[in-house]
Amino acid sequence: VDLFRSMDIPVRTIECCSGDLADLKVKSYDVEAWSPRQKKYFEVGSCSNLGDAQARRLKIRVKGKDGNKYFAHTLNNTVVAPPRMLIAFLENNLNADGSVNIPKALQPYMGGKEKLIPLD
């Protein structure tokens, strides 16, 4: 979420309904970015807690402080789906003249430029 916000992309997290969860998921959140073109949010990533279900299948155990072995709890995350990130970035930073605003977080990597200007 912070990555998207640092790129001046409006973003939100949505807790998924239990009826929408895949087989192993205990809890899941979707990360959604605002699309000015579509005038709605669209999914750009997700974060899911699989409890110990995946670890049971893979026989992944951890030793607890009490010395007993337990099945690990696992997470499944899509931090960034690059094509969706690019779409969200361009849609939220594009100007009417075709130039693209460079967020402050990226300006040091762009030689201090504040905008990308299209070539004629």
Regions from the language model: what does each represent?
Residues 1-120:
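TRNA-recognition modules of translation machinery and tRNA-sensing kinases, especially anticodon-binding
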